[in-house]
Amino acid sequence: LTDRVVERVDRICRECPDSQIGLNLSLDGIGDEHDDIRGVPGNWDRSMATWERLKELQKTRPNLVLTVHTVVSRFNQHRFREIYDGLQFLQPDSYITEVAEERVELDTVGWGITPEPDAYAPIADFLSEQARSRPVKGIARVTQAFRAHYYQLAKRVLYERTQVIACYAGWASAHIAPNGDIWSCCIRAEPVGNLRETDYDLAPIWYGERMAKLRKSIYDKECACPMANASYANMLLHPPTVAKVGLEVIRGR
């Protein structure tokens, strides 16, 4: 896929010159370890080839932002710091992580891949400190401050197994599955309608009874997860978090 990825990214960057185009390369280990976790022999080498080409492309496409992403799971939680250090040679514009979760779309339900709370806690603390210590300015400083809070939020969710702050999935965020199904999020993955059946009009689904029922379930805290996509929207709608982030940005911490 290297040629196809580079060609399409180049085209997107060219046609959207006033937008930042972000691309995440997901790496869960170094070399063979990454291949073993992903179950795809040779994936590391192909990823490196793609990354090298993208870094070269970035020289002529300044609006391209390249990020390295690691999914923290039971398979790599014990040596995360080694993996983190081992990926720095790639010199990404940013480095992010997410907690591994059992998801229908990834066919990982029942696999028990979520990291143990005690194993993830020091990882979260390390990542929060790294985010806060990065010498960035402007909107990047705000992004890093929210990122630092996200890692702490994820840690608490794993320990407490409940919504630490209110979840607005199904209101502030949603998920469109490849077949057109609308989910409140990719963790519950409960279809509330299909865009193909409404001529791609979201409104009948969004304001329908099935979505309302799912929203109530979420409001009643019948689920909890540390999924990044929903968590960032939730933090933006949580005044105490926004206030803390604002103070950190002002104080430069």
Give short role names for the model-derived ranges.
Residues 2-11, 80-84:
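Distinct, well-ordered alpha-helical segments
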Residues 8, 37, 126, 130, ...:
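Residues that form generic nucleotide/phosphate-binding pockets
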Residues 14-183, 187-197, 238:
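Radical SAM enzyme [4Fe-4S]-AdoMet core and its adjacent flexible, acidic
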Residues 164, 179-253:
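Flexible mid-to-C-terminal extensions adjoining Fe-S/redox cofactors in radical SAM and related proteins
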